[in-house]
Amino acid sequence: MLAGCFNLSGYSYKCNSLLHHQLPITNYQFSNHQIKSSGEVMYQEDIYNSQNVKKINNEQVDQIIKSIIAGKYSWACVLLLRYSGYNPIDYIPYRTYIRLLKNNCLGGKNQEGRNDSQEVLI
């Protein structure tokens, strides 16, 4: 049985390699995750990530669903990022983000009126 440890970009990794039927199986532990090179992946709850992610309430979920139904998938992504506690600017180009804000926040009241009139016609 071979065992070793190494450090890469601030994370400590443990590596255990076993020879079984001439097929090496390597286990890697990434702090709270364990991944086997044989293709089997075992997930453990990552305490760090669960502390950073906010819970989304029902009203916020409704807004996301309404934007998806309206075909505004990019805006749904912005809402999902926002409500989860992430900054959308970190994931979306600045110009795109500003355009989405203008179309959905500033012009949102005008567009809602248009959608209501369209729903009546349909």
Swiss-Prot record:
Keyword annotations: Heterocyst
InterPro entries, A to Z: HetP-like
Record GO biological process: heterocyst development
Summary of the knockout phenotype: Single deletion, no change in heterocyst differentiation, in a double hetP-alr3234 deletion no heterocysts appear before 48 hours, by 120 hours only 3% heterocysts form. A triple asl1930-alr2902-alr3234 deletion makes 50% more heterocysts than wild-type (although they are not active for N(2) fixation), while a quadruple hetP-asl1930-alr2902-alr3234 deletion has delayed development but makes wild-type levels of N(2)-fixing heterocysts by 72 hours.
Upregulation: Transcription fluctates after nitrogen stepdown; down-regulated at 6 hours, rises by 12 hours, decreases at 18 hours and rises again by 24 hours.
Miscellaneous remark of the record: In Nostoc filaments, approximately every 10th vegetative cell terminally differentiates into a heterocyst specialized for nitrogen fixation under nitrogen deficiency.
Quaternary structure annotation from Swiss-Prot or TrEMBL: In bacterial two-hybrid assays interacts robustly with itself, Asl1930, Alr2902 and HetR and weakly with HetP.
Its biological purpose: Delays heterocyst differentiation and commitment when nitrogen is limiting. Interplay between the 4 HetP paralogs controls the timing of commitment to heterocyst formation and its duration. Epistatic analysis show that the 3 paralogs act upstream of hetP to delay commitment (asl1930, alr3234) or inhibit development (alr2902). Asl1930 and Alr3234 must also attenuate the activity of Alr2902. Ectopic expression does not complement a hetP deletion.
Annotated family: Belongs to the HetP family.
Entry's free-text remark on domains: An internal segment (residues 19-108) complements a hetP deletion for heterocyst formation but only partially restores nitrogenase activity; it does not bypass the requirement for heterocyst differentiation master regulator hetR.
Protein's name according to its UniProt entry: HetP-like commitment protein Alr3234
Organism: Nostoc sp. (strain PCC 7120 / SAG 25.82 / UTEX 2576)
High-level lineage: Bacteria, Bacillati, Cyanobacteriota, Cyanophyceae, Nostocales
